[in-house]
UniProtKB/Swiss-Prot annotation:
Keywords: Cell cycle, Cytoplasm, Developmental protein, Differentiation, Growth arrest. Disruption phenotype: Morpholino knockdown of the protein causes an accumulation of neuronal progenitor cells resulting in the neural plate expansion. Belongs to the MTURN family. Residues 107-120 have a biased composition (Acidic residues). Induction: Up-regulated by the proneural transcription factors Neurog2, Neurod1 and Ebf3. InterPro entries: Maturin. GO terms for cellular component: cytoplasm. GO terms for biological process: negative regulation of neuroblast proliferation; neural plate formation; neuron development; positive regulation of megakaryocyte differentiation; positive regulation of neuron differentiation; regulation of cell cycle; regulation of signaling. This is Maturin. It comes from the Eukaryota. The keyword Cell membrane does not apply. Its main location: cytoplasm. It comes from Xenopus laevis. Pfam families: DUF4581 (PF15167).
Length: 131
């Protein structure tokens, strides 16, 4: 995919997130993204036909630790699309953006299941107190 097509994918992705595509540099194949409050990162795109992977990084030391999930995802086996990588970055930055974690729903469902099992837990406590 040529760089302009990748930039179009990134621009479309931005329309559904708090991020803006603030700069593109075709010679470096670099795209810079920014969202309030000061969350920024950039993506280096591989050359067309090259076996290289995408690369994500941030020049902000506050943002950098949050990119670990996306960096691990990129380095895992298999070819990734720009959209998949941007989605991972968005998920990584949700806490910095003040958005709920995507996995919170799963956790709440798990807690709901645990609450249903409370009578069983009471029974175990009774068994312990009898000893």
């Amino acid at each position: 995919m040529d760089f302009q097509q990748l930039a179009d994918v990134a621009d479309k992705w931005c329309s559904n997130t708090p991020f803006d595509l603030i700069a593109t540099e075709e010679t470096e194949r670099r795209m810079d993204f920014y969202a309030d409050p000061g969350v920024s990162f950039y993506v280096l795109c591989p050359e067309s036909g090259c076996g290289d992977h995408f690369h994500v990084w941030s020049e902000s030391e506050d943002c950098l630790p949050f990119l670990q999930l996306a960096q691990d995802y990129i380095s895992s086996c298999g070819k990734k699309t720009l959209h998949e990588i941007l989605e991972k970055v968005f998920k990584s930055f949700r806490p910095l953006l003040g958005l709920p974690d995507v996995d919170d729903d799963t956790f709440e469902e798990y807690n709901a299941d645990v609450e249903e099992e409370e009578p069983e837990a009471d029974h175990q406590q009774m068994g312990v107190s009898q000893q």
